[in-house]
Regions:
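Nucleotide second-messenger and two-component phosphorelay signaling modules
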Residues: 25, 57, 69, 87, ...
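Active-site core of bacterial EAL-family cyclic-dinucleotide phosphodiesterase domains
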Residues: 32, 36, 43-100, 138, ...
């Protein structure tokens, strides 16, 4: 403690905040306290106090980011994302609350809410005589430890009477790394019942060829976040080229996400990766705006 005028109780409180912060980190084993640590902790407590009320009162909104086929020049799907639209703070991005909800378990209820909203939206399109597109939803690792997970998903699909192919499940690459044997079995069971599975964020963590060899999925979503901001380097081109070719040889569809520039899009097309998701085509937008974009004449 550098300031002798800080009361002992305050100093202990500061040390407590720093201790909680450092426990969340996997690399550093010490940290210096500053006020941002305390502010972040207080913000998390506030979100925990408000999350139940927010869900019950419709503050969580489903946003959709289109998946666009560059060759066909049309939207072929979307990913459902969630935004917390707070009456006082405005839009709270998911990076602020998803990890907290993973930690306290609230993510299970929030995921279920998003899935239900998506199924309802697809049912609406069908009832209106419009041609729906598949919507993918994110799945927390916590769901995969529920022995009834498959039954929950199938029950939701049956409740709204939609084809299974229109609700796709997105599992992040990091899930498979932690328990590949368990998740390989779960995925095999899900696919046997006709549920479409995507591996999200491939290339953003510790991508494993062994993982791809053992896990049978429908779509590989390649994270293009590793692109150099100044342009695509030769090494990046080589990695991307062979990753896409490998996925296709394994009979997987490929979606490139995080595509932000025309150069990136054109290079992906040259590799026969024609479905993209990213700000180059469209940012995540409210579901009502997505409908207008999808069905504009």
């Amino acid at each position: 403690i550098l300031d002798n005028h800080i009361p002992v109780t305050n100093a202990c409180e500061m040390a407590g905040y720093a201790h909680k912060k450092v426990k969340k980190q996997s690399i550093n084993n010490y940290i210096f306290y500053d006020d941002t640590i305390r502010n972040d902790a207080l913000e998390e407590k506030q979100m925990e106090r408000e999350m139940e009320y927010a869900l019950e009162n419709g503050q969580f909104h489903v946003y959709l980011q289109p998946k666009y086929n560059l060759n066909a020049n049309k939207i072929v799907g979307a990913e459902a994302l969630v935004r917390w639209v707070h009456p006082e703070k405005g839009i709270i991005p998911p990076i602020k609350f998803i990890s907290l909800f993973e930690k306290n378990g609230f993510i299970i209820r929030l995921d279920m809410y998003v899935w239900e909203q998506v199924c309802s939206l697809i049912r609406k399109w069908i009832d209106l005589g419009e041609e729906p597109v598949p919507i993918s939803v994110n799945v927390s690792r916590l769901h995969l430890h529920n022995p009834h997970f498959k039954e929950i998903v199938l029950s939701l699909i049956n409740k709204y009477g939609i084809p299974k192919s229109f609700l796709e499940l997105e599992l992040t690459e990091s899930l498979f790394i932690k328990n590949i044997k368990l998740f390989t079995k779960i995925i095999a069971d899900l696919r046997m019942d006709g549920i479409v599975l995507n591996m999200d964020d491939f290339g953003s963590a510790y991508s494993s060829l062994n993982m791809l060899k053992n896990i049978n999925i429908d779509t590989l979503k390649i994270d293009c976040g590793f692109f150099n901001e100044e342009g695509i380097t030769d090494r990046e081109k080589i990695v991307l080229k062979h990753t896409i070719a490998m996925a296709k040889d394994l009979d997987m569809d490929v979606v490139a996400e995080g595509v932000e520039t025309k150069e990136q899009a054109e290079f992906l097309v040259s590799l026969d990766c024609v479905v993209i998701q990213g700000y180059y085509y469209c940012k995540p937008i409210p579901s009502a705006d997505f409908e207008k974009l999808l069905y504009q004449k």
